[in-house]
Regions:
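Beta/alpha (TIM)-barrel catalytic core signal, keyed to glycine-rich beta->alpha loops juxtaposed to Asp/Glu
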Residues: 3, 139-238
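Active-site groove signature of glycoside hydrolases
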Residues: 123-142
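Short, acidic/polar
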Residues: 32-46, 108-126, 170-176
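A short, structured active-site edge motif that brings together acidic residues
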Residues: 79-91
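Conserved, mostly hydrophobic/aromatic
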Residues: 6, 18, 46, 54, ...
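N-terminal binding-site loop/beta-alpha segment at the start of enzyme catalytic domains
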Residues: 1-81
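A structural motif
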Residues: 51, 128-131, 161, 184
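Surface-exposed, active-site-proximal loop segments in enzymatic domains
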Residues: 91-107
Length: 238
């Protein structure tokens, strides 16, 4: 397995990460409910193949993915780089409506108080006293960037998080966070061979700021591994 530094930090991460959307259960996150044993099995496979970068989010099953990971990580927390997210929550404490699912109303809130509470909730659910990386799940233009950056930097100083990043953003957002005094280590965006255009816009900026460009959706939610795609004969000009 190859490794790289996470942005300007001293954190070594594998170039392949485990995304844990599917551990969330419920109506959308996976086909069935996952267990702690499922999570342990995933971590075992990751460790066997040298993958140390684990990505989750509070809204994956409204807390379920984080809780399962927390239990599965007991006794081996230091073997993995743990990344979760902030901004999307179901506390009904303000922010912008994002979606309704499984009986919960999820809002997007990047105010300082919300970011701090998101991180504290994640620490509690996962039973750890620090998070290696926290990503703003959906960048929100309704609240000042300076406020969000200030909250994230405070959490770094407090030792609750080691670094932070952005997702579902625009290149201008990365520049704005940096210009507001931030140090964005990772940008996580949708990118695949079928949908490369949005990601390409980040490459020069990521190089400028030494920010890792992390992709999700690289298999187009399974389409690129489906029989319909794998067995298709493409023309030479396709």
């Amino acid at each position: 397995m190859k490794f790289q530094k996470l942005g300007n930090t001293d954190i070594d991460v594998s170039v392949v990460a485990l995304g844990t959307w599917g551990l969330g259960g419920g109506s959308v996150w996976t086909d069935g409910d996952s267990t702690v044993e499922d999570a342990k099995h995933l971590l075992d496979i990751c460790h066997e193949h040298g993958v140390n970068y684990i990505d989750t989010a509070p809204v994956y099953g409204t807390g379920v993915s984080e809780e399962l990971l927390g239990k599965a990580l007991k006794g081996r927390r230091n073997d993995f780089v743990l990344q979760t997210k902030c901004s999307l929550n179901w506390r009904n404490e303000g922010g912008n409506f994002h979606y309704e699912r499984d009986g919960y109303t999820v809002n997007n809130d990047t105010r300082a108080s919300a970011v701090k509470k998101d991180v504290e909730d994640s620490l509690r659910r996962m039973g750890t006293d620090y998070l290696d990386s926290v990503i703003v799940h959906y960048v929100c233009g309704s609240f000042p960037v300076e406020e969000t950056v200030g909250a994230l930097e405070n959490l770094v100083r407090e030792g609750k998080i080691r670094t932070y990043g952005l997702s579902n953003s625009q290149p201008a957002d990365l520049a704005a966070y940096q210009e507001a005094g931030g140090n964005v280590s990772v940008v996580q965006e949708f990118f695949s061979i079928l949908s490369p255009f949005h990601g390409r816009e980040y490459f020069d900026l990521c190089k400028k700021y030494n920010t890792v460009f992390q992709t999700y959706g690289v298999l187009e939610e399974g389409f690129l591994t489906s029989p319909a795609f794998m067995e298709r004969e493409f023309a030479k000009t396709d």
